[in-house]
């Protein structure tokens, strides 16, 4: 049985850890609110861009564009979005597990790592990292997403990538983050027919010109939304993990305190027994 001194030292250590995890939970909760607001603001815009893209593509009469061009697939690129840090439960592990299952059977996949965890994971497993974007900060900027999108667009247009996929964690709620894969390039335009009266649009200077401007914006917006979803999921997972760690620390403190009380009681009982034994010996 541990001594009272050892138990006091352990209780002090666990209390110190509990204070840290509690503070991290509060910080994650504050960041989560901001990240969640950003996701909720970005989703309608991304959906509207997709809707407009489908209308313009239909109006253009099947106009050709490099970002719509499907060709023989030789090189597949994966933009894999993770966090830069850990302490967020299984958030990173779930994304990396999904990404690993996607690239496992692909010959020489091009890895575009967004986040330190993504870069380090695939580097350790011998994959060549085509590009990495790490330490992007807590507040994701559109300029960061635009840089990543422009990189894969240039590679796709140059013929170095034949397909590009996004692998990230879609934010469902605080407790649920769902790893998903989304095809980014070539851009797939929805062809489903709308019900009800249709609105006829006039495009200036032409539907083809609007499409040429809209396609890169659509790719940039899709990457931006994925990064925002991943950031919200990271903070939600971290808040949940730190809340669980704080509760576990409390339970451990209670157990250690009980052990300390028992150790004290045993020591007192032993002292009383020694006193009684000594008194009996003097009689």
UniProtKB/Swiss-Prot annotation:
The keyword Cell membrane applies. PROSITE patterns: ATPASE_GAMMA (PS00153). InterPro entries: ATP_synth_F1_ATPase_gsu, ATP_synth_F1_gsu, ATP_synth_F1_gsu_CS. One of its GO terms (cellular component) is proton-transporting ATP synthase complex. Its main location: membrane. One of its GO terms (molecular function) is ATP binding. Gene3D superfamilies: 3.40.1380.10, ATP synthase, gamma subunit, helix hairpin domain (1.10.287.80). It is a peripheral membrane protein. The keyword Transmembrane does not apply. Keywords: ATP synthesis, Cell membrane, CF(1), Hydrogen ion transport, Ion transport, Membrane, Transport. CDD domains: F1-ATPase_gamma. Pfam families: ATP-synt. It is found in: Cell membrane. Belongs to the ATPase gamma chain family. F-type ATPases have 2 components, CF(1) - the catalytic core - and CF(0) - the membrane proton channel. CF(1) has five subunits: alpha(3), beta(3), gamma(1), delta(1), epsilon(1). CF(0) has three main subunits: a, b and c. Produces ATP from ADP in the presence of a proton gradient across the membrane. The gamma chain is believed to be important in regulating ATPase activity and the flow of protons through the CF(0) complex. This is ATP synthase gamma chain. It comes from Desulforamulus reducens (strain ATCC BAA-1160 / DSM 100696 / MI-1). The lineage of its organism: Bacteria, Bacillati, Bacillota, Clostridia, Eubacteriales. The gene is atpG.
């Amino acid at each position: 049985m541990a001594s009272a001194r050892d138990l006091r030292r352990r209780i002090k250590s666990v209390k110190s850890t509990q204070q840290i995890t509690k503070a991290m939970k509060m910080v994650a909760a504050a960041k989560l609110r901001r990240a969640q607001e950003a996701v909720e603001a970005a989703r309608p815009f991304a959906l509207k861009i997709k809707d407009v893209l489908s209308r313009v593509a239909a109006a253009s009469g099947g106009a050709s564009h490099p970002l719509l061009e499907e060709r023989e697939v030789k090189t597949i690129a994966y933009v894999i979005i993770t966090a830069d840090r850990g302490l967020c439960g299984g958030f990173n592990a779930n994304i990396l597990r999904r990404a690993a299952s996607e690239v496992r059977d692909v010959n020489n996949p091009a890895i575009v790592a967004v986040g330190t965890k993504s870069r380090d994971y695939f580097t350790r497993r011998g994959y060549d990292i085509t590009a990495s974007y790490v330490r992007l900060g807590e507040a994701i900027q559109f300029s960061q997403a635009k840089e990543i999108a422009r990189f894969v667009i240039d590679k796709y247009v140059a013929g170095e990538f034949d397909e590009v996929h996004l692998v990230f964690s879609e934010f469902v709620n605080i407790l649920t983050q769902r790893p998903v894969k989304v095809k980014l390039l070539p851009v797939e335009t929805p062809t489903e027919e709308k019900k009800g009266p249709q609105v006829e649009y006039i495009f200036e200077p032409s539907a083809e010109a609007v499409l040429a401007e809209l396609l890169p914006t659509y790719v940039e917006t899709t990457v931006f939304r994925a990064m925002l979803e991943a950031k919200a999921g990271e903070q939600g997972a971290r808040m949940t993990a730190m809340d669980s760690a704080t509760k576990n620390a409390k339970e451990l403190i209670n157990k250690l305190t009980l052990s300390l009380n028992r150790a004290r009681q045993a020591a007192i009982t032993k002292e009383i027994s020694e006193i009684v034994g000594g008194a009996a010996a003097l009689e």
